[in-house]
UniProtKB/Swiss-Prot annotation:
GO terms for molecular function: dITP diphosphatase activity; ITP diphosphatase activity; metal ion binding; nucleotide binding; ribonucleoside triphosphate phosphatase activity; XTP diphosphatase activity. Its cofactor is Mg(2+). It is an enzyme of class 3 (hydrolase). InterPro entries: dITP/XTP_pyrophosphatase, ITPase-like_fam, RdgB/HAM1. Binds 1 Mg(2+) ion per subunit. Belongs to the HAM1 NTPase family. One of its GO terms (biological process) is nucleotide metabolic process. Mg(2+) binds at residues 38, 67. This is dITP/XTP pyrophosphatase. The keyword Cell membrane does not apply. Disulfide bonds: none annotated. It catalyses: XTP + H2O = XMP + diphosphate + H(+); dITP + H2O = dIMP + diphosphate + H(+); ITP + H2O = IMP + diphosphate + H(+).
Amino acid sequence: MKEIILATSNPGKIKELEQLLAPTICIPQADLGIFDAEETGLSFIENAILKARHASSLANKPALADDSGLVVPSLNGEPGIYSARYAGRKANDEDNIQQLLSKMADLSQEQRQAYFFCAIALMQHAKDPTPIIATGIFHGIISVKPSGTNGFGYDPVFYLNEYQCTAAELPAKIKNRISHRAKALNQLRALLPD
């Protein structure tokens, strides 16, 4: 892959994808005047396909979309596919984190288990009948308060026992090796034709 459209407007995702996909030339959809597709799917995979197809159809080029989010089993999978808008459509990362911490205030350590799930869809063209789908999972625990300034989204409350810090305290070099997005992209690379 020499050039690909990134079907996202999320600056954090764009930065991570550009780092993880190098040396591929990544063109954020906004650079081409493409707005986000409406996420009407019922799963991360459905939403990734919708977003990749939308960007590919408008750019007339291959497009890659990532739909990912935080899953907390003790909250019946919340925030799940609604991770970016957990505290409402106009919410920012801090609002979403506060909503999550509020819902988890009375939960025990065992009930604070969580994971990030990433689904990546690569469409060679808008009518691609066989998009390449890859997934990755990143396990952790939801901390009781935010810590760290790296990353984005729920990273400041996503605690990693193995590293004794949150994802927001990890250096990008380490996070880009172990995260759900890194795992999904590694799987995608293995699925790409030579």
